[in-house]
């Protein structure tokens, strides 16, 4: 199994050096949930791996209550920075991630990495200490900065006008970094992260600028904001812990505990990420440096239960750790004593009755003291090593099985970091399939972490945000709200669908004012969307604010960008007035005003007819005929006028009180059909037909028509020829405009 695991590891290693972590790999909500926890919470809400070290992944339990507690605290410690973004694959100079890659080895050597919990609540350590004077001067320093140069103003204006111009941001950030301008850097980076918080490389650049100017406290705050935004970023955790080790205050003797707490926050935040190997390796290396071998074993016990890219290498290193050290050093005292008793019982002669009655512990030294007999001591050590490896082998075997189920999905992730460029379809499909697999087979914790990883790479695709929010609905209302807020305010400010879903969610929760503000915000961001305006109208209508609903529609009519848009809203307003407010007169007035401004729009006439039909048709006969005449005398297209002409004949046939009016309508309809036929012949033959031939054809058509009308048999007034009544059922609505083409069948064209 190990060999197979190593071969798979090699495959991924060929794609990404070291642990396979992508240069810009970031973390999102899963860790955001963690970021809201306080240090005291960590002991009760550690990932299942850390709680049940000896159990395989499938047995790990992540209770719904724990998930709820985590997600409910997501936003408690939110810092001014918005959710994190990832580095983009812009030109080399624009890719902060690439520059940071070259610095990663130093970070790994100097400090273990950790993706931790939310920076604001991380009671990891007192922020790295600098002399009090520089820290105190940090705030007053800003106003003392020289005025911003003209070039800065020019570059800043570009991104202010178009925040989605990522290259513009890159040029601005490069400029302030090259000019070493502290005030400009602060303004530029703070503005940049409001739009692209997932670019972890730029968080490090920002922190480095603060550090170079001597503002260690500010640099620490920048790191914490970055980890608040992207807690799944292994790389950012590595840089941060390196920063802590270089700048920590060792005078109080708590430096070691602070670093250890940082690592714990880190592995809690992103330790279950498939590509978190370097974080675990750094943690292990640091504990080894401290000489805490029992802690190293405890870390391995957690790691060997987690499906990661380098799972096989971890097990091999664990065996080396066991073989290279004395069990009493790398095991906790409790496990050491328990294992010693277990081995003593196993080696006790089975036929010795006296031995059975004698407690085995009485033959053994107390605690972790060595056996007096050197030979027995060596044997005991070897047996203990064998037993320790044997128990972890079972964990490894199960973990390898879990890795094998996910390997194809992980290998299919070619861009695990954020970028403004669109993802390939194969990448999107891989994420969809991976999420579906984890939803069906994984624990809630693993599902959350995978969603968070997905949202880094797919931050600009609303389908994944929506899917994540739907998943969290069964766990926590606050978690759902957090996801929608992050999607709509940071990553997808101009995607209406996710905003509409967020507003609907808030309305379901009874937060009507919040729903209103969401819809207003998206309408400001993307003006002119009918779906948003109609959702605002329906929101007000559902809650009895009819005046506001009417005002919204009236405003849309008045401020329509063209007559067609105004007509659309006029129809909506008329329907509301009729169906909801029971005001037929006002509805008719709205439609008539719309007809005056847009007389070629057939939908207005159809809705006006529907309005007239809704009453007593016998009493409204004159108004209905007037409506038909208004449509027929308009400058609508001929095909539309034929449709209204046919409907006028239908109406008079069904409800008319005057045969003369009916016959006049029929004759008018025949003239329109003849006009249409003439246009068809011209389209087919052009204007090259001799006038004599064209006249003969027209005469024959007229004669044939007259003969049909004059025949004394049923065909002279036959519904099958003149009015195909069955084709017009009561199920048809006046508003079904797409059926215009069907009305030509009512009147077959004159024979030619």
From Swiss-Prot:
Sequence ranges of Basic and acidic residues compositional bias: 678-699
InterPro entries attached to this UniProt entry: HAT, TPR-like_helical_dom_sf
Residues covered by region (Disordered): 1-148, 347-374, 678-703
GO cellular component, one term: U1 snRNP
Acidic residues composition-biased segments: 352-361
Chain intervals with Polar residues compositional bias: 28-42
Low complexity: bias regions: 43-56, 76-94, 133-148
Protein name (record): Pre-mRNA-processing factor 39
Gene that encodes the chain: prpf39
């Amino acid at each position: 199994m190990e060999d197979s695991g190593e071969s798979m590891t090699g495959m991924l290693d060929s794609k990404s050096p070291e642990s396979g972590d992508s240069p810009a790999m970031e973390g999102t909500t899963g860790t955001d949930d963690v970021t809201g926890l306080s240090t005291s919470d960590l002991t009760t809400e550690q990932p299942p791996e850390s709680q049940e070290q000896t159990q395989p992944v499938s047995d790990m339990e992540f209770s719904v209550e724990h998930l709820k507690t985590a997600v409910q605290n997501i936003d408690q410690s939110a810092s001014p920075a918005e959710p994190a973004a990832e580095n983009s694959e812009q030109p080399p100079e624009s890719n902060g991630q690439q520059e940071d890659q070259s610095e990663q080895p130093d970070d790994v050597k100097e400090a273990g990495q950790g993706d931790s919990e939310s920076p604001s609540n991380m009671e990891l350590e007192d922020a790295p200490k600098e002399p009090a004077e520089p820290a105190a001067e940090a705030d007053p320093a800003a106003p003392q900065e020289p005025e911003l140069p003209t070039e800065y103003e020019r570059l800043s204006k570009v991104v202010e006008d178009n925040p989605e111009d990522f290259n513009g941001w890159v040029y601005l950030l490069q400029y302030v970094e090259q000019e070493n301008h502290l005030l400009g850097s602060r303004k530029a980076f703070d503005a940049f992260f409001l739009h692209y918080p997932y670019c972890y490389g730029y968080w490090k650049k920002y922190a480095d600028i603060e550090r170079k100017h001597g503002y260690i406290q500010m640099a620490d705050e920048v790191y914490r904001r970055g980890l608040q935004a992207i807690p799944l970023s292994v790389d950012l955790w590595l840089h941060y812990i390196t920063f802590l080790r270089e700048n920590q205050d060792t005078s109080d003797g708590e430096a070691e505990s602070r670093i250890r707490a940082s690592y714990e926050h880190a592995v809690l935040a992103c330790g279950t990420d498939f590509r978190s190997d370097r974080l675990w390796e750094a943690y292990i290396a640091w504990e080894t440096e401290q000489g805490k071998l029992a802690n190293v074993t405890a870390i391995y016990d957690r790691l060997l239960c987690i499906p990661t890219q380098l799972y096989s290498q971890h097990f091999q290193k664990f065996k080396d750790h066991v073989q290279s050290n004395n069990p009493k050093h790398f095991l906790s005292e409790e496990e050491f004593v328990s294992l010693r008793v277990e081995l003593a019982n196993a080696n006790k002669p089975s036929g010795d009755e006296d031995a059975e009655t004698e407690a085995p512990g009485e033959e053994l030294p107390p605690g972790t003291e060595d056996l007096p007999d050197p030979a027995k001591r060596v044997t005991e050590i070897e047996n203990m090593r064998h037993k320790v490896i044997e128990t972890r082998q079972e964990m490894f075997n199960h973990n390898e099985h879990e890795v094998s189920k996910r390997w194809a999905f992980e290998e299919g992730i070619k861009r695990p970091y954020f970028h403004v460029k669109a993802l390939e379809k194969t990448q999107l499909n891989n994420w969809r399939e991976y999420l579906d697999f984890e939803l069906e087979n994984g624990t809630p914790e693993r599902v959350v972490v995978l969603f968070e990883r997905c949202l880094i790479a797919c931050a600009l695709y609303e389908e994944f945000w929506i899917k994540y929010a739907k998943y969290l609905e069964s766990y926590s209302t606050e978690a759902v709200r957090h996801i929608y807020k992050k999607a709509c305010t940071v990553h997808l400010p101009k995607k209406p669908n996710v905003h509409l879903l967020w507003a609907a969610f808030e309305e379901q929760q009874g937060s009507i004012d919040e729903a209103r503000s969401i819809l207003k915000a998206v309408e400001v961001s993307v003006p002119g969307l009918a779906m948003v305006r109609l959702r605002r109208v329906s929101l007000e209508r559902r809650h009895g604010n009819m005046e506001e609903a009417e005002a919204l529609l009236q405003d849309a009519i008045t401020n329509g960008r063209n007559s067609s848009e105004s007509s659309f809203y006029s129809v909506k307003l008329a329907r509301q007035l009729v169906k909801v407010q029971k005001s037929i007169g006002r509805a008719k007035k709205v439609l008539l005003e719309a007809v005056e401004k847009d007389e070629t729009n057939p939908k207005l006439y159809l809705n006006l007819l529907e309005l007239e039909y809704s009453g007593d048709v016998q009493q409204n006969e004159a108004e209905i005929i007037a409506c038909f005449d208004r449509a027929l005398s308009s400058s609508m297209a001929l095909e539309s006028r034929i449709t209204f002409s046919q409907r006028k004949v239908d109406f008079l046939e069904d409800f008319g009180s005057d045969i003369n009016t009916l016959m006049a309508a029929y004759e008018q309809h025949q003239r329109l059909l003849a006009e249409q036929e003439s246009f068809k012949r011209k389209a087919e033959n052009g204007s090259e037909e001799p006038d004599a031939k064209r006249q003969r054809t027209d005469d024959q058509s007229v004669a044939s028509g007259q003969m049909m009308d004059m025949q004394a048999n049923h065909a002279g007034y036959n519904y099958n020829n003149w009015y195909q009544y069955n084709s017009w059922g009561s199920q048809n609505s006046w508003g079904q405009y797409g059926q215009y083409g069907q009305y030509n069948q009512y009147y077959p064209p004159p024979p030619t």
